[in-house]
Amino acid sequence: MTVSYTLKVAEARFGGFSGLLLRWRGSIYKLLYKEFLLFGALYAVLSITYRLLLTQEQRYVYAQVARYCNRSADLIPLSFVLGFYVTLVVNRWWSQYTSIPLPDQLMCVISASVHGVDQRGRLLRRTLIRYANLASVLVLRSVSTRVLKRFPTMEHVVDAGFMSQEERKKFESLKSDFNKYWVPCVWFTNLAAQARRDGRIRDDIALCLLLEELNKYRAKCSMLFHYDWISIPLVYTQVVTIAVYSFFALSLVGRQFVEPEAGAAKPQKLLKPGQEPAPALGDPDMYVPLTTLLQFFFYAGWLKVAEQIINPFGEDDDDFETNQLIDRNLQVSLLSVDEMYQNLPPAEKDQYWDEDQPQPPYTVATAAESLRPSFLGSTFNLRMSDDPEQSLQVEASPGSGRPAPAAQTPLLGRFLGVGAPSPAISLRNFGRVRGTPRPPHLLRFRAEEGGDPEAAARIEEESAESGDEALEP
């Protein structure tokens, strides 16, 4: 059964995730404790052997091997390999979940398209939705061990009511070397076409909509089957597994406490006459390697996460509840196309019939939310310039072929030492203000403000020419 803790993390609070660490079902402790105990036992055996059973010469050789293993373990890019692999597995896991076929859309279309309150109409609707559920049961039998244990043979499928004996005989008479989960979908299409000929489906548009929804449903069944068929390449899984196991095999030897290497002590101060040098100091003798055990817990746990969700249709604690999905889909779909068909509550005026702005009430616990202003956009409270000239509308002239003028920034020009824009700026490139004469002060770059005198003179000439053109009828 899927482990759900959504309610426990509904609010961010102190120690919110810490409370989840005490759970056992679906936890990393349940997945990893055997490997963790094995790693600790092997580490203890090697430590006891080094401390009690080896001679001084053998200890020296062992220390050399341990230092070599410790250096070699750091050469394995474990975080890089595991990160990519777990990301791939998690994306695949979620895609498999979204590929589980649900009949909700299809049952609504059946209820709206297949008409008739008599026994024939009821039979058509129930049979169509039963065929859809049968297709999902057949494909889930092929990919989920839980469903296969529930329906080990086709006789169990018949006894569960998803298929009749005649349908089973017809199904088994079809000879094919491939999985036949698609057969109920073909029965569905043939029965829908017959309902159209009989007038139960009133037009071709409704039939087309019904078949489109069926194809979406069948596509999910097919995708689920192909996810089970095409796995993540085995070589990738092998590389990741070998990398993790190799890292901790080297760590078993390399992380052991050994005597410090000669000359490894830090440089000491000058000794006084008669003072003996201090012995070489190494790492403290940790009988329990806490950091190594934590590293094993993180990396091996990371690999266990991928191992659990790489196939979510098994029987682990966090695998998909396929049997409950089958029960839910059958019950809901039959209810919608049979008992709920044309079974409507009376249409009545709603509570806010005469109100222009309906406002549902709040409880005391949520009343403060009603005082918050509604979100109108990130730029709603942006302060605009008080200068009215900045809000004047102008028309661009894309046919001019000349570059648009740059805005004059006197303050920036003082700091950067830049002059006025290029003399190639023409007043004809500026659009006219809609409904008003062109204000020359918007385009004039005066020489006394730090601009180019030659550019200012040219702008004055073009301003005069444009003014003459505006006066002509």
From Swiss-Prot:
Residues 396-407 have a biased composition (Low complexity). One of its GO terms (molecular function) is bicarbonate channel activity. It catalyses: chloride(in) = chloride(out); hydrogencarbonate(in) = hydrogencarbonate(out). The keyword Methyltransferase does not apply. Residues 445-461 have a biased composition (Basic and acidic residues). Residues 379-408, 428-473 are annotated as: Disordered. InterPro entries: Bestrophin, Bestrophin-like. Ca(2+) binds at residues 10, 308, 311, 316, 319. Predominantly found in colon and the weakly in fetal brain, spinal cord, retina, lung, trachea, testis and placenta. The chain crosses the membrane at residues 32-51, 61-82, 238-255, 290-303. Keywords: Calcium, Cell membrane, Chloride, Chloride channel, Ion channel, Ion transport, Membrane, Metal-binding, Transmembrane, Transmembrane helix, Transport. It is a multi-pass membrane protein. Pfam families: Bestrophin (PF01062). GO terms for cellular component: chloride channel complex; plasma membrane. Residues 462-473 have a biased composition (Acidic residues). The keyword Cell membrane applies. Residues 1-31, 83-237, 304-473 are cytoplasmic. It is found in: Cell membrane. Belongs to the anion channel-forming bestrophin (TC 1.A.46) family. Calcium-sensitive chloride channel subfamily. Ligand-gated anion channel that allows the movement of anions across cell membranes when activated by Calcium (Ca2+). Mediates the movement of hydrogencarbonate and chloride. This is Bestrophin-4. It comes from Homo sapiens.
